[in-house]
Amino acid sequence: MERSCSAGHVLAPLHHAARQVEIVAGHNSVASSRLLRPSAGVFTSRARGTTNLVFLLRPPGVYRADSDTSLLIDVMIAGGYAAGRRVLDIGTGTGALALAAARAGATAVTAVDLSMRSIAATWVNCRIHRVQCTVHRGDLFEPVAGQRFDLILANPPYVPAATNVVSRHRINRCWDGGINGRAVLDRLCTEGPGLLAPDGMMLIVHSAVCDENVTVRHLNDAGVRAEVLARSTIPFGPVMRLRAAMLEARGLIQPGQRDEELAVIAAHAPAGGPRVR
C-alpha cells in the first residue's frame, strides 16, 4: 500500500488503542474485547444477492461501518460505478468503502480521514485484505487538492448535534454534523464537484433528517447534476435514540418517530467537468 507516512508512525495509534478493539458481528451485535484483533463486519450486497464477510480492524473512536455504509456499497456495486475508475473515499473510517471499491475493480483507490486512528485502521485493513490504497490524513479534500477522480464516495457525519462546537470526544466526531447535521455535508457539496473528472460521479449517503433535497440543490448549484439514487428506512440507532427528543423539539422528526430514511445522492459531472452557475 502506498502511504504518505512511515508504517511505524501510522500504526502508533493502534498500539495505544490495542486493548479496546471491538469485535463486530453484523450490524446489531457488538461484543467487546481487550485483544487487538480485527472486527468482523457483514455487508450484504442486494445487487449481487450475496453476503460478503469482511474483517475490519476498528480501534476506539473510529466509525463502525453500518447500514449507511452498506447502502452506499450496494449502490456502487449495482451500478458498476467503481470498475476501472479512480476512486476517492472521503472520511474513510475503517476503510470499508475503499476496500469495497478496490474489490469492485477500481484501478486506483485513495482514502482520506482527519483521524489518525482511522488512517491507521484503513492502512492495516488494506494490508490484511491485500488491497492497494493511497492513504492520506487531512481535512476533507485538502490532501488531494488539484487531483481528479472518477468516483468520490462519502459517508460523512450527519447526525444533528446540540451545538456546532466540535466535540472533545473522538467517537462523537464520527457522527456529529453540527446543529442541522449539514456542517460537513455542505462542504462536500461545494468542494467535491471540483475534484470530479469529466463524466465523474460523487456518491453521498446521509439521513433524510438533514434533508436530501438540500443536498441535491447545493450540488446542482455547484455545477453537477444531482439525484437521489436509493433510499432505505432503518430503525434509529443508539445515537439517534438518545437525541430523539432534541430532534422532535426542532421539528426534524415527527413526535414518536423512531426510524429514519437513508438516501444515497449521486452527483454527475458533465463531460467537460462541473460548470459553476
Q: What residues fall within each predicted segment?
A:
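A short acidic, Gly/Pro-enriched loop at the edge of an enzyme's catalytic core
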Residues: 141-152
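Mobile active-site "lid"/loop adjacent to the S-adenosyl-L-methionine
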Residues: 156-184
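Short hydrophobic alpha-helical segments enriched in small aliphatic residues
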Residues: 10, 16-17, 28
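SAM-dependent Rossmann-like transferase core, predominantly class I methyltransferases
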Residues: 38, 42-104, 115, 121, ...
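Conserved Class I SAM-dependent methyltransferase catalytic core
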Residues: 182-240
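Conserved SAM-binding strand-loop segment of SAM-dependent methyltransferases
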Residues: 130-140
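Conserved SAM-binding motif I beta-strand of class I
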Residues: 108-113
